A protein has these predicted regions:
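Membrane-water interface segments at the C-terminal ends of transmembrane alpha-helices
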Residues: 2-35, 48-155, 184-204, 211, ...
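Short alpha-helical elements of helix-turn-helix
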Residues: 145-148, 160, 179, 204, ...
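Short glycine/proline-centered loop/turn elements that form peptide/ligand docking sites
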Residues: 158-162, 262, 271
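Glycine/proline-centered hinge or cleavage motifs at structural transition points of membrane proteins
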Residues: 169-170, 183
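Short, Lys/Arg-enriched, Gly/Pro-containing loop segments at transmembrane-helix junctions
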Residues: 255-264
């Protein structure tokens, strides 16, 4: 190996050790619940815990609801900003980036104050209302990631030409959006969806202060009262996050601007008009 390559290789190796060693140590500790042998006893205990199944199921359902609401909000917004309201683009980008600046604790206290039992819209009076409020909060937290992913996908296709072609064939606006534009940004929407899923699964502040049985507060509770199970849960959460990142990369590598079957864009416009 050339001397000029040794330095970068050493830096990469040390950086890899910095990230990999804590994971290896955590995984090794999670296998040490039974003295003297390595076993998956901690994982068995975690998966056998009814509270784990309840909280994880709750967070998965909340994540799916967040993805649906986020996509319904972001896809039309990104479409209209690129098609008709280019001057509003800086404002829309500023609004979508606010969740990165404003702490979640500020958001949740605002929700509690605005939608408490004495409010004109008392969401916190019922479990279903509080769950809905939690999903709204998750949508806000996921806006920077969902909007950026969808907007990047729309930048890769000619929205104006597609819209004009579909309109010339008699397609309505809703048809254009859902049958022409959406199939071409499907990979971008899925990328934002996987990021949203990873965020919601581990979110703690909103779920804890709204007193919802989510996976994030469960992780904190187990971490405060157990020894080996938190390590197992950390590895499970890590695996879920990296699975989402892998799926994101898989869909992101797909060529934009083509339908699922590989047909050109103008054929989508013709099909939408039928």
């Amino acid at each position: 190996m050339n001397a000029s390559r040794i330095g970068p290789a050493v830096i990469v190796f040390l950086g890899a050790l910095y990230f990999v060693l804590p994971l290896v140590a955590t995984f090794e500790f999670s296998l040490s619940m039974l003295r003297g042998i390595w076993s998956f006893e901690a994982y068995r205990v975690v998966f056998a815990d009814p509270q784990f199944r309840t909280t994880f199921s709750f967070s998965v359902i909340a994540a799916l609801a967040t993805i649906v609401l986020g996509a319904l909000l972001v896809v039309p917004t990104a479409y209209w900003v690129r098609l008709r309201f280019a001057k509003l683009r800086p404002l829309v980008e500023f609004i979508t980036l606010l969740p990165l600046v404003i702490p979640p604790i500020v958001l949740v206290f605002g929700y509690i104050r605005l939608y408490n039992s004495s409010s004109w819209l008392p969401f916190t009076n019922s479990a279903s209302g509080t769950n809905l409020l939690l999903v709204f909060g998750y949508v806000v937290l996921s806006l920077p990631y969902m909007f950026r992913a969808v907007d990047t996908g729309m930048a890769a296709i000619d929205i104006r030409t597609l819209t004009e072609a579909a309109e010339s064939l008699g397609a309505k606006r809703a048809t254009i959006l859902f049958r022409v534009i959406l199939p071409n940004v499907r990979a971008a929407v899925l990328s934002g969806a996987f990021l949203t899923f990873a965020i919601v699964i581990g979110e703690f502040v909103l779920a804890s202060l709204l007193n919802r049985p989510a996976f994030g507060p469960y992780l904190a509770l187990i971490g405060a009262n157990r020894a080996y199970e938190p390590a197992a849960l950390a590895m499970i959460a890590f695996a879920i996050t990296w699975a989402c990142m892998g799926l994101l990369q898989l869909f992101a590598n797909r060529a934009p601007g083509r339908a699922r079957s590989g047909r050109p864009l103008f054929k989508l416009a013709r099909r939408a008009a039928r």
